[in-house]
Design a protein with these regions (language model features):
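Phosphate-binding glycine-rich loops and their immediate beta-loop-alpha structural context
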Residues: 116-123, 129-182, 189
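Short, charged beta-turn/beta-strand-edge "cap" motif at the junction between a beta-strand
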Residues: 89-94, 135, 218
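Short aromatic-glycine-enriched beta-strand elements
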Residues: 50-54
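A conserved segment at the C-terminal end of the G1
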Residues: 222-238
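Structural detector for short beta-strands of small beta-barrel domains
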Residues: 37-48
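Helix-rich effector regions associated with P-loop NTPase G domains
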Residues: 1-19, 38, 59, 70, ...
């Protein structure tokens, strides 16, 4: 029976086997023991309008044993799929959300509205960024996705889908090279969800009960890849428009999906998400620096440390642009992201000042 956690550093022997199969590890066990809380820890598998589906152990044969899954209210709890939470002893509510080790989030509000964070997936180890080979390479979108992925604390992996629809190997190489150019150092996989090409390589990222998240625009083939990874029909699929290769949302809710075991290791977990149209920045971390390592490395050679890479003398970045070693569009993209991040920081600071003045801001206890 779950009770008050013990203080101190946990060992492997302290980790419950059922929770371990959901991704629980020694780090989580140590955190749990240090909380000294009553209740029972579990993982959020799905959110539905104020309700959380929480798993205590993974599904067996596609269904849960009685008592292994509960549906509880999110009263006063800011939760996301993938979160580890503590459910009250009476199984009525979520009492506490354990501190996240990683979180993929973006700005949720539209222009003109107050900025709010939207956590898409929590406690993930890897983020699969899906782009369809049948569509023209969207370098600017990928750059934004990489910033968010690096800021999340997870490892970004670029997945190029719908290989089965490409009959020109040279065009595949060209489109792959275009996206690879703005993803230095990032793992890249070319796959066909329909035929299964390259899918086993993706499954290995989740081996050992790790959690991967799948993100991309509508129509890139997420649902087909999910079904192939899982080995069954988890999501419905839909055709895309031939004119612009845009698709319809076939995934309507974020959910945690079990991946089967394979010869290279234990099973893992996949967080499937609806198609993301707008990729807006939220957190201010090292994401831009890590997504634009090529630009920042050039910046280290500039004459002035505070060089803006405009028309300053001795600017190594502008020199690289003039020499054709750096795409001017990539530099402008980075500048836009830096400006967007700065504006967001200013907006957040201004809002906190107003909330402090009006007494609305939550105080730490």
């Amino acid at each position: 029976m779950w009770g008050i956690g013990r203080r101190g550093k946990a060992t492997v022997g302290d980790v419950d086997d059922a929770l371990r199969a959901l991704g629980w590890n020694v780090t989580w066990e140590t955190t749990w023991q240090g909380l000294a809380r009553t209740g029972r820890p579990g993982r959020v598998a799905r959110l539905d309008r104020g309700w959380s589906t929480v798993w205590y152990r993974p599904a067996h044969g596609g269904s849960h044993a009685e008592g292994d899954v509960v549906r509880v209210r999110n009263i006063g709890a800011d939760v996301a799929v993938g979160d580890w939470v503590v459910v009250s002893d009476d199984v009525e509510r979520i009492e506490f959300v354990l501190p996240r080790q990683s979180a993929f989030m973006r700005r949720a509000s539209f222009e003109g509205q107050r900025a709010e964070a939207h956590v898409i997936a929590a406690n993930i180890d890897v983020v699969f960024l899906l782009h369809a080979l049948v569509a023209p390479p969207n370098q600017r979108r990928l750059e934004r996705e990489l910033v968010l992925a690096f800021d999340s604390g997870a490892q970004p992996v670029l997945v190029l889908s719908k290989l089965d629809l490409m009959d020109n190997a040279n065009e595949v190489e060209r489109r792959m090279a275009a996206l690879e150019a703005v993803a230095p150092g990032v793992d890249i996989h070319v796959v066909s969800g329909l035929r299964g090409d390259g899918v086993d390589a993706l499954r290995r990222y989740a081996a050992g009960y790790r959690t991967v998240a799948l993100l991309g625009a509508s129509g890139v083939g997420k649902s087909t890849i999910v079904n192939t990874l899982v080995g069954g029909q988890v999501q419905s699929t839909a055709a895309v428009r031939e004119g612009d290769q845009r698709g319809r949302h076939t995934t309507t809710a974020v959910q945690l999906v079990a991946l089967p075991s394979d010869p290279v290791g234990a099973a893992g977990w996949l967080i499937d998400t609806p198609g993301v149209r707008a990729v807006s920045l939220w957190s201010s971390g090292t994401g831009i620096e890590r997504a634009f390592t090529d630009v920042f490395e050039l910046g280290e050679k500039c004459r002035f440390r505070d060089c803006k890479h405009d028309d300053e003398p001795g600017c190594a970045v502008q020199a690289a642009v003039q020499a054709g070693d750096l795409d001017a569009r990539r530099l402008e993209s980075m500048k836009r992201l830096v400006a967007e991040e700065a504006a967001l920081e200013d907006e957040q600071k201004a809002r906190l000042k107003v909330e402090d003045r009006r007494g609305f801001r939550k105080r730490k206890t």
